[in-house]
Amino acid sequence: MAARLCCQLDTSRDVLCLRPVGAESCGRPFSGPLRALPPSHPSALPTDYGAHLSLRGLPVCAFSSAGPCALRFTSARCMETTVNAPRNLPKVLHKRTLGLSAMSTTKIETYFKDCVFKDWEELGEEIRLKVFVLGGCRHKLVCTPAPCNFFTSA
């Protein structure tokens, strides 16, 4: 199974949008308004694409060239965080948060393949955007949305 996400950051609205750009599996194909676009044309995405599912309140590390300190996954039906994820995931993310060299990313990749892409690739039920919630770090949020409880390690 292989799946890719295209990330579009709208700094004017502090919104991070992720969309599928392709899939290779025996699962059901993407359909509806989120039809895959070629990965070489990220600018073809409209500025309001998926705005209703966008994430607000990004920590400052989201804008770093090195990327965010940690990732949490959420969808319309479930919440997986560094708190309730498998035991090895919080350990790896915490090490990264502290700036230490982390273990191999194989376990993280496996975790996200199993949890994040299961609905897309195997069940074919979720056609809306999947959203990665940035958090789990010592950086302050740009603005904290009321319904979201960000995990902090510091």
Curated annotation (Swiss-Prot):
GO cellular component: host cell mitochondrion; host cell nucleus
Pfam families: X (PF00739)
Keyword Transcription: yes
Residue span of region Mitochondrial targeting sequence: 68-117
Locations listed in the record: Host cytoplasm; Host nucleus; Host mitochondrion
Family annotation (InterPro entries): Transactivation_prot_X
GO term, biological process aspect, one: symbiont-mediated activation of host NF-kappaB cascade
Main subcellular location of this protein, as a coarse class: host cell
Function text: Multifunctional protein that plays a role in silencing host antiviral defenses and promoting viral transcription. Does not seem to be essential for HBV infection. May be directly involved in development of cirrhosis and liver cancer (hepatocellular carcinoma). Most of cytosolic activities involve modulation of cytosolic calcium. The effect on apoptosis is controversial depending on the cell types in which the studies have been conducted. May induce apoptosis by localizing in mitochondria and causing loss of mitochondrial membrane potential.
HAMAP family: HBV_X
Record family assignment: Belongs to the orthohepadnavirus protein X family.
Assembly notes: May form homodimer. May interact with host CEBPA, CFLAR, CREB1, DDB1, E4F1, HBXIP, HSPD1/HSP60, NFKBIA, POLR2E and SMAD4. Interacts with host SMC5-SMC6 complex and induces its degradation. Interacts with host TRPC4AP; leading to prevent ubiquitination of TRPC4AP. Interacts with host PLSCR1; this interaction promotes ubiquitination and degradation of HBx and impairs HBx-mediated cell proliferation.
Record protein name field: Protein X
Upper taxonomic lineage: Viruses, Riboviria, Pararnavirae, Artverviricota, Revtraviricetes
